[in-house]
Regions:
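Conserved glycine(s) in the ABC-transporter nucleotide-binding domain "signature"
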Residues: 1-158
Length: 158
């Protein structure tokens, strides 16, 4: 049985955790969207539609879970309405959004849903930031270990 490099094993475990965090975040986002769509079906009309969007993406080992506001421009009568996304920023150094910033783009009926969803996603963002830092640290440690091993081999050959 071949022994696996401990750094590779640690990195694999951390990457698996990032994948699990993304899957959990995606599940929360989808439940949020199901609740929004359900309410919108029961209450037709543009005035009842949500103007807040939630998305979850994974690229490499990074997870992006963010909110953006929606604004509509143009004439309904002329059928030239266009949607513009408005970036909602998190406070520096924070893993969660300020609820008043989100509520500024939300309808009254969706505020409790936003509060619940953001509490769950904030915890995932916090853990993901620590896991990605651990992945980077393991990569650096592996690089140092391999460079130390190669320098020892060179010294032994002399």
């Amino acid at each position: 049985m071949e022994k696996q490099d401990p750094y590779m094993a640690a990195r694999d475990a951390l990457e698996d955790r990032m994948e699990a965090l993304h899957d959990r975040a995606y599940e929360i986002v989808m439940k949020h969207w199901e609740a929004v769509k359900s309410y919108e079906r029961q209450s037709p009309g543009w005035e009842n539609r949500s103007t807040l969007q939630l998305r979850c993406d994974k690229k490499g080992n990074s997870i992006r879970i963010d909110w953006c506001g929606l604004k509509w421009y143009g004439s309904k009568k002329l059928d030239n309405r266009k949607m513009i996304r408005i970036t909602i920023t998190k406070p520096p150094g924070s893993h969660g959004y300020h609820l008043p910033k989100l509520y500024a783009h939300a309808k009254e009926w969706e505020k409790p849903l936003i509060k619940e969803t953001e509490a769950k996603l904030g915890a995932i963002r916090r853990e993901a930031s620590h896991v990605i830092k651990a992945i980077i640290a393991v990569r650096y440690a592996a690089k140092v270990a391999s460079s130390d091993a190669s320098s020892l081999l060179k010294e032994g050959a002399d």
